[in-house]
A protein has these predicted regions:
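Active-site and donor-binding regions of nucleotide-sugar-utilizing enzymes
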Residues: 24-123, 227-230, 245-248
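A nucleotide-sugar donor-handling region in carbohydrate enzymes
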Residues: 104-166
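Nucleotide-sugar donor-binding patch of glycosyltransferase catalytic domains
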Residues: 247-327
């Protein structure tokens, strides 16, 4: 990774995210130091308006680590994300996820500060710091000033009997070049039917507006992250295109079966894996792999996991969480 890269190395023209100028990066060392060593009484974290995967594997870990230094922490993020911020007061913004960009998003530092100050005025907050994505703009800022604190997400399962595979079929029309990451419904239907023919028990997760569930699959999609974590907790594996819900599964300690059109995308999950759960690759050259190919990897992965965990009676993650801020 380049020393001052804000996000990983996407191909040229693909990174729809705010790009920091060199002068901006240098100027941000001072506010990082002030907030790190002389924090105010309260903290506004956000507004966060980036990708769900970045919120899971980067942002919320930093916010949790800062929480102990403040009397109160107010997080401004997308609706439905309260579960990620225990001990914080969560507020929603109205930024359209489909137009927010990639990585940490398109908001520039000035606009981010305006929105944070407006929220502070709205709730009558004084003596506050603003922790936003600009303070994480390079690996040096993260390494010098910030730490992450991850917790293992666990909830009681939704069913008494474990589900072999929990799918996430991405289906969001997002502005930018990643629209091709969606798995076509026809392929999802075929994959689910092939799995059922092999005797596998299945379910689907995801936001109802941004994911697809075949008609013959148990529908556990929800806007409530707590319920989604409960659904993941019911599964033995989670399978899907390499996107936010796959990162969520890793934070739940669940093995994942991924596909993506580039290996560098798979590498994200291999590095962003604080609990070191097993990760299997169904395809690293396509977001739309053939259902038969995915099925073969699913079957092989379940067999390997059964042997590794004494027929799923032992956990397959490690504690404590490993640092991944600059991974």
């Amino acid at each position: 990774m380049l020393p001052f890269a804000m996000t990983a190395n996407r191909p040229a023209g693909e990174s729809s995210t705010y790009i920091y100028r060199s002068a901006e990066k240098l100027s941000l060392f001072l506010p990082c130091a002030r907030q790190r060593f002389w924090p105010g009484r309260n903290l506004i974290a956000g507004p966060y308006a980036g990708e769900f995967g970045y919120e899971l594997m980067q942002w919320q870990g930093f916010v949790r680590a800062r929480r102990r230094h403040y009397q109160a922490v107010h997080v401004v993020t997308y609706p439905g994300r309260e579960y990620l911020y225990e001990g914080c007061q969560v507020h929603y913004h109205a930024i359209d996820l489909k137009k927010a960009g990639y990585g940490y998003g398109l908001l520039d530092p000035r606009r981010t500060r305006e929105l944070a100050d407006a929220k502070a005025a709205e709730i009558g907050l004084r003596d506050y710091d603003v922790f936003d994505a600009s303070l994480l703009c390079t690996r040096y800022h993260k390494a010098l000033f910030w730490r992450q604190d991850f917790r293992l997400f666990e909830e009681p399962p939704l069913a008494a009997r474990p589900c072999d595979v929990v799918f996430h079929f991405r289906a969001v029309d997002k502005v930018g070049s990643d629209h091709f990451k969606n798995y076509p419904p026809a392929l999802a239907d075929e994959l689910v039917q092939r799995c059922l023919d092999r005797g596998l028990s299945l379910a689907c997760i995801g936001h109802p507006a941004y994911s697809y569930c075949p008609a013959n699959c148990v529908d556990w999609r929800s806007e409530d992250l707590r319920r989604t974590v409960a659904a993941i907790s019911t599964g033995r594996t989670v399978a899907g295109e390499n996107s936010g819900p796959m990162h969520l599964a890793n934070l739940c300690g669940k093995p994942t079966i991924l596909w993506a059109q580039d290996q560098w995308r798979i590498d994200y999950s291999l590095r962003w894996n604080p609990f070191r759960v097993p990760i299997y690759t169904a395809a690293n050259d396509s977001c739309q792999p053939a259902p038969e190919k995915v099925l073969n990897v699913i079957v092989a992965s379940l067999q390997e996991l059964a042997a590794r965990t004494e027929n799923f009676t032992r956990r397959c993650y490690t504690l404590p969480a490993q640092p991944i801020a600059n991974a």
